[in-house]
Amino acid sequence: DERLGLALHPFDLATNKVLAMAGRLEVRDWVDLLQTDASLQTLGLLVWAACGKDPGYNPTSLFAAIRRHHYSQEEVNMLDFEVDPPCAAELGVRWHDALQEAAAFFSLLPAERAGTCVLTESGALFNGSAQELATELEQNRIVFHKGHIRGAWPQIR
């Protein structure tokens, strides 16, 4: 597309960040994942889907690889923010909350669907709690979308 060029869907970017965080120690990956956990889809479901991009991981092993990271205020300050850098201690609290919530998702989801994107029946990214996911699964209102290597052109709506 001449106006937009090639673009990844935000979900693809987020799952790529999960995989990046498993393999390197970059504070920007941590900050980005905290933001996507809050704005796109919960960390547990991003981990669930991301393991489908790398057959060397399952949700539990990928989760273990990312949960070990922690960062200092000095490292956060080195990033370029439009405003003052966030407080690393507050980010750490958010990270531990996201990790605790993420772990609850893995026991609910069917193992044979690991590596898929968890969607609502209308095709939107599921964004509820683990308890809400349990209810949606019981009522067969969850769709598992297996990604593919191909991509899609961006659309302006």
Task: Locate the predicted segments by residue.
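Compositionally biased terminal segments of proteins
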Residues: 1-157
